[in-house]
Amino acid sequence: CPITTHLPLKLVSKQITKKKIKEKIVIVNDFYRKYLRYKPRIAVTGLNPHCESVLKFNEDKKIISPVIKSLKNKINVKGPFPADTIFLKNNRKKFDVIIGMYHDQVLAPIKTIFEYDAINITIGLPFLRVTPDHGPNEKMIGKNISNPISLIRSLEFLDKR
């Protein structure tokens, strides 16, 4: 679950704000409680490699950490964690959801681990929106080569709600 979506990497750090991080954590928590009926264990990645900040770029300490600290009494949230290790099996099994700072920080590992067996849930809307976890692949249109697993998982998820 990324804080920012489809942005060039050079623009990401300017879009990482305390407000956006807090909103995303709260929305994810509310979604789990409403639709899945339990309090999720949420991990948040840092922005910089290994969550190390140099003096000029200090997003992990100045922006991300204070938000997590402010929510810890209300929401089961921890971090920031290095994005290169949070998706390792022993780390990710400790959490129900991992919130990252940008699209590829989260989606690249998810698609590598789960391939087509993942779904996209758009949260924060007044209705439930679920789609297959892949973008439109126009090169596959009409060739009968697409994999339907993600569509099937999306329908199964909706059927349980």
Question: Where are the regions that the model predicts?
Answer:
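Short, glycine-/small-residue-rich phosphate/pyrophosphate-handling segment
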Residues: C1-V26, N137-R161
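Glycine-rich phosphate/diphosphate-binding loop of Rossmann-like nucleotide-binding domains
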Residues: P2-P80
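Glycine-rich phosphate/nucleotide-binding loop
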Residues: V67-R161
